[in-house]
């Protein structure tokens, strides 16, 4: 159709109803005939129910005819349609707000209820943040086979700046503990979907045990090692001193005991799924552990891990532990240094790094990483880390990275 120049106006078109193939194409076909320009568009489909919004700019000489044709087409397609004029000032105000900060709030649990979401969105509102869109990250929930529903995750895209981020984080942590759900609140920038290096603690993170406790139990010194650990936790001795004392108690233990423990290490829920996806997507993976390389190497072989840095136990010519270690101790400070070193070697920006751990020794690397996650962590670590997972498995990390179950296909299933 020939376009006769005139004054232009903005019209917001809203369409709801039963979705079907070709509906959007039919609407766009009408708009195309009148040379309408698309200023904004968004569509959502929930249980085959469509919600489509289109903001157009069109010559006001044609706007009446366009709306008339769209009304007839909506009736033909059995959908609801509405129109709202948008003034130039309103439109420009909307454009000016596009530079506002964006954040992503991820909510994860074994299941999610209206009560939990109501509490989370109340905190969002109190902080003056606006929800741009909401999407489900996990697969569809079966009513017939509830045992298949192992986790639920919803992601909120938010716009604005929190009035008090520290207070918001505190309220989210309290809600997480009270409602048995997990949260991640992070800036939605280009690095969020471009993470490239992930560093894990090993004991009580990738595996559900503390290897030094297993070794101590086999050596018959479990109570002594536990007492030293408790002294360290009270701050009576530092990590290096406590580590040296505990290793000394393992003197004489046969290396075959280590092999037996390594072969039967309990793998953390979700670790297999997480590692499969990370390797498939090209992530570099590191273990940075205050534990022992012997067990880290077992995990390297299992998952194809790229880097393992842990503590080396000295073994004598008879295959017995000497009660000493070789090289420098990997403590919290060293973990943070190693994260930065590996990032440099791999030419990865620190904003593209992830650190996951449970203990106080993990806090330095969690703080250093672009995304630091406390996993089933000690209270002090949970209180310090910006993101935490306490109620589901290790594969919950995937949702913090923006993965949807629908992206993962068969390899992403349990």
Show which residues each predicted segment covers.
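Solvent-exposed alpha-helical segments within well-ordered globular domains of core cellular machineries
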Residues: 25, 29, 68, 72, ...
């Amino acid at each position: 159709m020939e376009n006769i120049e005139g004054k232009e106006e903005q019209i917001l078109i809203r369409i709801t109803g039963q979705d079907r193939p070709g509906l959007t194409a039919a609407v766009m076909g009408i708009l195309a005939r009148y040379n309408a320009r698309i200023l904004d568009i968004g569509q959502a489909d929930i249980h085959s129910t469509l919600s489509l919004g289109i903001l157009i700019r069109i010559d006001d000489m044609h706007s009446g005819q366009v709306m008339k044709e769209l009304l007839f087409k909506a009736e033909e397609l059995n959908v609801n349609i509405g129109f709202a004029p948008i003034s130039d000032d309103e439109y420009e105000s909307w454009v000016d707000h596009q530079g506002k900060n964006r954040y992503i709030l991820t909510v994860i649990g074994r299941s999610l209820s209206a009560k939990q979401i109501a509490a989370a969105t109340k905190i969002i509102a109190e902080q003056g943040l606006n929800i741009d869109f909401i999407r489900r990250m996990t697969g569809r929930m079966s009513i017939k086979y509830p045992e298949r529903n192992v986790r639920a995750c919803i992601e909120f895209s938010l716009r604005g700046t929190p009035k008090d981020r520290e207070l918001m984080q505190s309220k989210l942590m309290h809600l997480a503990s009270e409602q048995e759900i997990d949260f991640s609140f992070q800036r939605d920038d280009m690095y969020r979907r471009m993470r490239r290096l992930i560093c894990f603690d090993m004991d009580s993170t990738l595996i559900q045990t503390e290897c030094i406790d297993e070794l101590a139990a086999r050596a018959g010194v479990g109570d002594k090692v536990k007492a030293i650990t408790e002294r360290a936790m009270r701050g009576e001795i530092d990590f290096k001193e406590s580590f040296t004392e505990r290793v000394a108690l393992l003197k004489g233990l046969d290396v075959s005991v280590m092999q037996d423990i390594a072969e039967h290490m309990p793998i953390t829920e979700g670790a297999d799924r997480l590692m499969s996806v990370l390797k498939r997507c090209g992530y570099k993976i590191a273990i940075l552990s205050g534990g022992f390389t012997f067990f880290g190497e077992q995990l390297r072989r299992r998952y194809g891990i790229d880097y393992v840095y842990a503590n080396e136990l000295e073994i004598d010519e008879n295959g017995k532990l000497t009660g000493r270690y070789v090289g420098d101790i990997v403590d919290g400070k060293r973990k943070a240094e190693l994260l930065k070193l590996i990032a440099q070697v791999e030419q990865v920006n620190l904003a593209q790094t992830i650190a996951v751990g449970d203990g106080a020794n993990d806090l330095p690397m969690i703080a250093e990483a672009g995304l630091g996650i406390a996993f089933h962590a000690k209270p002090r670590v949970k209180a310090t880390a910006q993101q935490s997972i306490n109620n589901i498995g290790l594969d919950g990390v995937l949702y913090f990275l923006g993965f949807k179950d629908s992206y993962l296909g068969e390899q992403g299933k349990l």
